[in-house]
Amino acid sequence: STIVDTTGEVPVILRPGGITREQLEKVLGRVELDPALAGAETLKPRAPGMKYRHYAPKAKMYVVEDKEALKLLPLLAKEAAKFTTAAVICGGAAAETMQRTQNLHILNWGSDTTELAVKLYRLLRRCDKLGVGIIFSEGVTEDGIGLAVMNRMRKAAGRQVLTAADIEALLKNSTQLKSFVLK
């Protein structure tokens, strides 16, 4: 659910949800985002459910957001699955092209961000049932409902995000990759 502070001159989204920023702006005019949404540790969240890892899976989870990192995700997942059972939560096109193995589960959230908004927690619970040791999740753009989805996804991952540089470093060193996967 979306939480908005309307006590100031400009409304501020404290927690993004089903009512998007764009929808609010059509009614209220300019709407800002609470700086705490960016994940700055020094800022105290002003809405409930914003501070701690929330609806988190049992496994370690990492969000992969940038396009270069997403290109490397299939190889990272395949290599990680050599050390533990892994899962990738991703959209239609990526899910269709990734190769499943006995230790690598590909969980398809569908074709658009609205589908992911509906399925995210169900997919995280599925990872728990599958007993995976590590989860990689494809990020989405933060327009519309994507802002709320990414907020929930980052919280579930404990704000752990992998960049292309992170993935390249892990893929260059199998000892480091094994340590990363099993930590």
State each model region's role.
Residues 1-183:
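Active-site-adjacent structural elements in enzyme catalytic cores
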